[in-house]
Amino acid sequence: MQLTHFGHSCLLAEFGQTRLLFDPGTFSHGFEGITGLSAILITHQHPDHIDVTRLPTLLEDNPAAELYADPQTAAQLGEPWRAVHVGDELPLAELTVRAVGGCHAVIHPEIPVIENISYLVGDSKHRARLMHPGDALFVPGEQVDVLATPAAAPWMKISEAVDYLRAVAPARAVPIHQAIVAPDARGIYYGRLTEMTTTDFQVLPEESAVTF
């Protein structure tokens, strides 16, 4: 598996010829020129996870890509987007993508909770090779190989980020959702996630593929 981080929550996961793109949002960059995608998967409707301005060009460049999103986002986007519900299993070539979670993390009690689908990607070697939770602290209750773990968010304290990484306890983790933090300050968050957990924590270089 190869992972490429395009900033914030946008990840490209490549399994041989099968290429999955998660959450191409407004805080992400460099995904515009990607071609050959097998699927585009959206966790939820917030703009930092789906940039509706740049999305049409991405779809034009990837006419064969299957398009999946949480039910609320799929309803907003319309056809050909498909709604993904908790419990769904999406067969994508040699992969199986499972939909789990269902709800966005609480930002404030007065702000309505929207839908959020977390994705578990399984290959021939691991049932949960990769997990992309979106904006949620969902614990799948099974061993995850690589977790794309939220590093910072308006809905999360650093203590909660540490506790989440401890709870999932993946073999490896890469941070996402860090665009809201100034680049010079991100080391504070990464340091806590590295020092206070036993997970192999690796910061991905932006727009460069890393093999796992």
UniProtKB/Swiss-Prot annotation:
Originating species: Mycobacterium tuberculosis (strain ATCC 25618 / H37Rv)
Name of this protein: Protein Rv0786c
Signal peptide from the UniProt entry: none
Superkingdom: Bacteria
Pfam families per record: Lactamase_B_3
